[in-house]
């Protein structure tokens, strides 16, 4: 549903319950790169790889892991590499992968699964010392033929104390980066760029105590999205640059999400600024903080929807057709303790906008205050004048058009700014 324009948001604070939002402990690898290099460096060129974009690099990486997976650095020097054998590294400890080259998917390979998978183990780091390392999935070779069930790029599963940073993930045939049941991790200084179609998710994450910051995503589906089984996340300085937008979704049976912070989220020409999607199921979502959102040209702004179902594109591109604030909760189990404040929204088309609330209690927008009442409700509030502070800045790197699905997508340069006025927490590795 990524049609043209919707609204502009200058600042938004949404608070559910009382969380201040934070990590529960330290994140990132337990030992430094220099410590790992002091143990051993395994250059993939010594294990049969060649940087000619013709010879498979997958098996040489796995061979290098045999020597460096229990302590050391697997080094992929600058140059172009072809991957035909998908990489699966299991239960490594105190090791890193220094990806300074570019890995290209073999266009004739029909294997599914993840091109690059790290599972189990601890104290792991995937990074580029030049900030120019990348994985190029060449997904357009699938997409131009209408195929979207295809390989994914990067998977981190059940790993503790880890980081991924200073690399680009480009044109995934399916998902770009999936984090499953990982803990104490950090993701930063990344650029993810995919085609303009659903199912090409940027980052999907579940686990405990994870910090994701200073990341740019371009696609038409999830930007940075939290999945069930997520706790103690801090997600900030995120640049959804012509994307699907950030979300919390696939919340079905056994939902269990708590202590999640989204802060400093800039959303340009996307489906939504933030959406929580569910339809039935059971479980609990609690203690969420959404703070400092800026958006331009988005189809939806804040959409908490417990009646989500597949929808056709909504006609119209104004705030009356697409409510910028929409909080829809179940009749049997309403949402409580929601605070919406300091919100400045206005439509880019038309002269009015609506807020829609249903069985949601708290303060702000169209919420009802009395959650002790057993009466269900649904209400629509119409706003006919622009708030005084709704105008917001833009970013210099805002895209003027999406990338299609029938041509190669260029590898982007990782930006040095991900949110207006916010300095990234870490300088690019390649800047030193």
Swiss-Prot record:
It is an enzyme of class 3 (hydrolase). Transmembrane segments: none annotated. Keywords: Carbohydrate metabolism, Cell wall biogenesis/degradation, Disulfide bond, Glycoprotein, Glycosidase, Hydrolase, Polysaccharide degradation, Secreted, Signal. The active site is at residues 221, 296. It is found in: Secreted. Pfam families: Glyco_hydro_28 (PF00295). Disulfide bonds join 42-68, 223-240, 329-335, 357-366. GO terms for cellular component: extracellular region. Its main location: secreted. Residues 1-21 form the signal peptide. PANTHER family: PECTIN LYASE SUPERFAMILY PROTEIN-RELATED, PTHR31736. Pectinolytic enzymes consist of four classes of enzymes: pectine lyase, polygalacturonase, pectin methylesterase and rhamnogalacturonase. Hydrolyzes alpha-D-galacturonopyranosyl-(1,2)-alpha-L-rhamnopyranosyl linkages in the backbone of the hairy regions of pectins. This is Probable rhamnogalacturonase E. It comes from Aspergillus oryzae (strain ATCC 42149 / RIB 40) (Yellow koji mold). The lineage of its organism: Eukaryota, Fungi, Dikarya, Ascomycota, Pezizomycotina. The gene is rhgE.
